[in-house]
Curated annotation (Swiss-Prot):
Its main location: endoplasmic reticulum. Keywords: Endoplasmic reticulum, Glycoprotein, Glycosyltransferase, GPI-anchor biosynthesis, Membrane, Transferase, Transmembrane, Transmembrane helix. GO terms for biological process: GPI anchor biosynthetic process. The gene is GPI10. It is a multi-pass membrane protein. It is found in: Endoplasmic reticulum membrane. It comes from the Eukaryota. This is GPI mannosyltransferase 3. Glycans are attached at N80, N242. GO terms for molecular function: alpha-1,2-mannosyltransferase activity. Its EC number is 2.4.1.-.
């Protein structure tokens, strides 16, 4: 590699990083609770000693790799509230830039530099990426490690040092999310039938996996302060006990007719047009079929194959008329701006408002985890005198049936089953009467009728024109105590 090539690579990475840094700071909306409660809250709790730990972290289901990245950021910025909010945004931009830079490098190795440039540009202007890639989801980190592994994968069917780099990145992606193994099963079979297997190769690969497992165990021990094996705990909860269905089920075709169209938006026709029968197509199909068999489904669960979808989109792009593609890209930009700056912005506006007001206590009468917590507030007092409705799963059940799951009611369910009765039973008792209460617009009549003498509306934020969860429709409202 020449000096000019290295310089060009640095410039490209710097451009992508600056682009994603702007993207990260431009996001003013809420997507899903895991962005805050499965990475930032555990990291905040680890560094500062307070923050909300969901049951997954109490049960040690998650690898420490993801939150430890944010631990580094928090340790660097110290106790400054503004920097506590900013540091994850910078880290997320860096993670995204690493992913997209290596997507470009992967396509050069797999196909051509021309297609690599097109894939990168399509990735940068993809609205789902603009909406998701700089958020603190473990699926994003999983996707980045997947792309890194694909970049170094032995596509030329020759085993050398690149294989061991690929194996390392691929195995870490499976540690972060064990279901990522669905990508490596077809690729692994393809490799095994394409190369000459030697004892040295098997032994060195095995030793590398063992070494990574030992390092990961040490990281988990450091984070949890006890010897634990999150990979086993994850399998016990999701497979052996089958408790993941508590968080909802979706039809088998969810990923085909909902997730992929959402992830690609107006790129979808290009992706279909660019499909080619090869190992990447087989890998993508195997991954989607595997995830379709799992009852609990979410859009971001198939995010690790998004780079593969973009590769096929790029193939479709080179066959299509550029002017129509340009119109699609411009419309995609509008869609991305709507979801990052308009839809569900009230939740973030509310959190910023409460943080700047230094409210002494607040109660959230909302579906569980509807707002960020200490990763935005950074206020130890709120941990002791504030609350929100919880939604712990039925950990006492072992392989529950759908009927048992339907009959189990968490705290949030109990409230929405009978709001007034719940408030009569709990408010002012196990749920203290706080200085402020937060509700979504559908509960406005309840607040006015039942608590109108004690609380008055003191602030209101637009949140959404529509929402998949009717409990979160409309504005989000702050009530202050008289």
């Amino acid at each position: 590699m020449t000096k000019s090539t290295v310089l060009s690579s640095y410039k490209l990475f710097a451009f992508i990083f600056i682009f994603r840094l702007a993207n990260s700071f431009a996001i003013e909306t809420f997507f899903q609770a895991d962005e805050f409660f499965q990475a930032l809250e555990p990291a905040h709790h680890f560094v500062y000693g307070y923050g909300y730990l969901t049951w997954e972290w109490k049960q040690q289901l998650r690898s420490a790799i993801h939150p430890l990245i944010y631990v580094l950021g928090y340790k660097l910025v110290g106790d400054n509230t503004t920097l506590v909010c900013i540091s994850p945004k910078v880290i997320n931009a860096l993670i995204a830039a690493i992913g997209e830079y290596n997507l470009y490098k992967f396509i050069i190795v797999y196909d051509s530099e021309k297609l690599a440039w097109i894939t990168l540009m399509l990735s940068l202007f993809n609205p789902f990426n603009w909406y998701v890639i700089t958020r603190s989801f473990s699926n994003n980190l999983e996707m980045v490690f997947t792309v890194l592994a694909l970049r170094f994968w032995p596509w030329n069917k020759k085993i050398n040092g690149r294989w061991y780099i690929s194996l390392g990145f691929g195995f870490v992606s499976c540690i972060i999310r064990p279901t990522n193994i669905l990508i490596w099963i077809p690729l692994g079979i393809w490799l095994l039938i394409s190369i000459r297997i030697t004892l040295k190769w098997v032994a060195l690969s095995f030793l590398e996996v063992v070494l990574i497992l030992l390092i990961n165990t040490a990281l988990d021990y450091y984070f949890y302060q006890k010897l634990t094996f999150p990979l086993y705990n994850f399998l016990e909860f999701n497979v052996f006990k089958n408790l993941s269905i508590f968080y909802g089920t979706a039809p088998w075709h969810f990923y085909i007719f909902q997730a992929i169209p959402l992830m690609l938006m107006l790129y979808l026709p290009l992706m279909i047009y660019g499909l080619k029968k090869n190992i990447l197509l087989l890998t993508g199909l195997f991954y989607i079929i595997g995830f379709s068999l799992i009852q609990h489904k979410e859009f971001r669960f198939i995010y690790p194959i998004h780079p593969i979808l973009l590769y096929f989109t790029a193939r479709g792009y080179v066959k299509f008329k550029p002017k129509f593609v340009l119109i699609g890209i411009l419309l995609n930009i509008c869609i991305g701006l709507f979801f990052t700056n308009v839809h569900e912005r009230g939740v973030i506006d509310l959190t910023k408002y409460l943080a700047t007001q230094q409210t002494p206590s607040v109660g959230f009468i909302t579906p569980c985890h509807s707002t960020p917590w200490q990763s935005y507030f950074h206020n130890p007092n709120l941990d002791t005198n504030s609350w929100f409705l919880a939604c712990e799963p039925p950990l006492h059940l072992n392989k529950p049936s759908m009927e048992e799951i339907r009959h189990y009611r968490d705290q949030s369910d109990q409230f929405y089953d009978a709001p007034e009765s719940f408030l009569q039973t709990h408010l002012g008792k196990d749920l203290p009467k706080t200085e402020q209460l937060v509700v979504f617009e559908p509960l406005e009549p309840l607040m006015n009728d039942y608590l109108g003498r004690e609380y008055y509306e003191c602030q209101r934020f637009y949140n959404s024109f529509f929402h998949w969860d009717s409990r979160r429709d409309g504005d989000i409202i702050v009530y202050c105590r008289n």
